[in-house]
Amino acid sequence: MPLAACSSDDEIAIATLEISKTTVDFKSEASEQSLTITTNAVAWTAQSDKSWCRPSIVGKLLKISVDQSDERLVREATVSVTADGLSKTIRVRQLGYEAAILIDQQAFEVPAVGAQIKFAVTTNVEVEPILSDWIVEAPKTRSAEMVTTDYCYSVRASILDNKRQGTIVFTEKLPEDATENDVPVSATVSVTQHGLNEYNADTGEDIKGDIKLKVKDGTASSFQGGGEIEKSFDGDYSTIYHSSWNNSGSNYFPITLTYNLEEVSDVDYLVYYPRTDGANGKFKEVEIQYSEDGSAFTPLADKDFLGSASATKVLFDAPVRAKSFRFIVKTGAGDGQGFASCAEMEFYAKNPEAFDYSTLFADETCSELKAGITEADIEKCEFPFFKNLAYYMIKGKYEPEFRVGEFKAYPNPDIQSGTHKTNPYSLLDNPTGISVKANENLIVLVGDTHGYDISLKVQNLDAPESDGFGGVTYPLSRGTNKLTISEKGLVYVMYHTRTLDDAAALPVKIHFASGTVNGYFDSQKHEGRWNELLGKATDKYFDVVGKYAHMTFETNDYRKYAANNGNELIDLYDQIALNEMQLLGLEKYDKMFRNRMYLNVMYQSYMYATSYHTAYNQTTMSDICNPSKLKTSACWGPAHEIGHCNQTRLGVMWIGMTEVTNNIMSEYIQTTIFGQGSRIQTEDMGDVYRNRYSKAWNGIIVAGSSHADFSNIGDDANDVFCKLVPFWQLELYFGKVLGRTPLQQSDKGGFYPDVYEYARNKDYTGMTDGDIQLDFVYNCCLSAKMNLLDFFEKWGFLTPINKKIEDYDTRTLTVTPDMVDALRHKVNGLGYSKPDVALEYISDNSFELYKSRASVVAG
């Protein structure tokens, strides 16, 4: 029967399970050994698959007892330890009466700088070890003949570029009367030592992480059932504390959260982890207090968390001795007044046993040795991780590219999202070129942060049937940061400012002393290195960065579709992003986005756009990762999705326009920038209509329908590409005919740049969708400096309507005769003349005629 043990802790965290040894060897006599089991589970069990091997639980120890063996050969059993769904096994071996040698660990991998290796040998014969010449015996801790003996050997530092293999062979010493037929038993320990040609970081186990202080309990002045404060210190980052969903009361804020530590402690900092599955409740303005006795509280800090999605470390100016911490949440993200939520709140004391960088390195980033350091100095270092790092450096074998970098600050993209009324651009402008594995220790050495919050995001795009965009954030502080990575992925530095221009946000030097170099390609600094960097990539995904765009696609897709022309690929995406910004008027009005447009591969849906990124199914890569196709037939998709991000709300995106006005950008990129045929001109429409122009003319102008509600032959009523026609006609006439477009104006201005600038500056508060549609007409007249009422009337913008429109959301679009009369009065009051051409008939095939002013006849 399995044995069970229970923890005395009331709170269950995410289960952990560690066993001090995974192989246990016994002599043939009945005996027992004890192993330490480390777990935070409430209960754990142990069970053996053999009756001669019996596990028993004594507190936190697992005692394994074996019966005497009368068998000839070594026998084996497996003990399974299970804790809260986690399971690990222990291999149990026992000698028989025939000669045998058992070694509990028979393979070691050591760094180039050398290391000590330890293992136990259990045998019933006298043995003699034979060593490779670069492995030497260290002082024994104990020795006992023909039972279990602990051995310790030192592996000398290597000066070789490549790995080397060595062995320690234990061979039975035969008695003097042995005959030639007696064959000695033997067992081998293999030792692999890394060479100097490729840096291999130590595991970092010797680096002492800061001490996480246990929270005993807590209280909240407001909470939603199922979202109690206990969810914010249960060790599970997927569960959250959440304030009451009813936030309508005038006294909803402030909300007070109190955390009580298990004991009074010296506390150096805390970490706030916001929820990862939404925005509601992410902290904004918070007052933090502390108390040594749990009753009298002292103000500690005022912190604006800005509703950030990143984990935030709050470092105290000096350690505080505290039993309790109180958070007075004054504002939080979310609808209405907002809410308060927290995935985890953690409190830490710095570890006094931390490595002193000044013994070997020039600064806290440990990116170069201090002047005068010798190999003898390095040999004295008692921290294997830093000893190994220093050894590579002194041998001139440490490659700093992608491991050491200066990372600049970027404005939070939410800033320009607010001023430009668009989706926010990228949060991932600082790729590192480092990839990490789940559960590995990532050692990050950080220089002066200049008082700013810096964090890492690990993004794992390998999400079958999903989109892995996002990831886990890890706050950083100056000095040594030891991070235990929860999920594999690529690493990005998150360094964002609250304002567009912040002179104090100087670059931060960061050293990734572990993790794997995957690299990335930046067209602005890696000219001519595409083949080299892509060839060296080790991860499934690879970052390609341009001046205006940044994409993360599968490495193999780059190799397959852009093997020798990745620079052209990112230049094309830069062109799309840049030219859409120019058509928005952002260059003309000195409002260019400071963040890049981000594109990532995903495995659900087809393509889509949302906050901070656009996403593309892996099945589209043969088109959008191929420069030859991207600049011809495949440009529409990315231009369309990026166009969604750039839609100016609400002035150029009222109800019904979500899949319409973004395609102003698609048409512009397809025709004006890449010189391809226009989709609405050339796309095959079957037997009834020649093209979208014909279909739109018949469905709206001839029928006298509202632009928002028209019908055509067939099942595709309210075709969004038909709705696009008048918007594109405006660019054809004012842009291609009159030259009022960014490519033809030296200031990068034009008709649409002015339209978008008006929409950015206009306050639409209190306006209905019908008001906004009519205001767009006014905007166009103002920007064109022409009276365009006839044009918009023919295209149904002035046609009365009162109908619910489904467009991701459902709202009623109302345009009344009185509203139209008011618009006419307002536009006519501008005093502009009407166009002297039949503007409603211009098309991609006919705009040249408008240049020559040939007569256009309706029909």
Show where each model-derived region lies.
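Beta/coil-rich, acidic/histidine-enriched accessory regions frequently appended to metallopeptidases
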Residues: 355, 361-397, 771-859
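Aromatic, loop-rich ligand-recognition surfaces of beta-strand-rich domains
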Residues: 234-299, 308-362
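Active-site-proximal alpha-helical
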Residues: 692-804, 808, 813
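Juxtadomain low-complexity/linker regions and immediately adjacent membrane-anchoring helices
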Residues: 190-234, 275-286, 328-399, 800
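Surface-exposed binding patches on compact interaction domains or structured appendages
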Residues: 34-63, 102-103, 123-152
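Beta-strand-enriched, solvent-exposed domains that form extended recognition/catalytic surfaces
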Residues: 358-519
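Catalytic cores of extracellular degradative/oxidative enzymes
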Residues: 530-533, 540-738
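Bacterial Sec-dependent N-terminal signal peptides
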Residues: 2-27, 54, 84-104, 175-209, ...
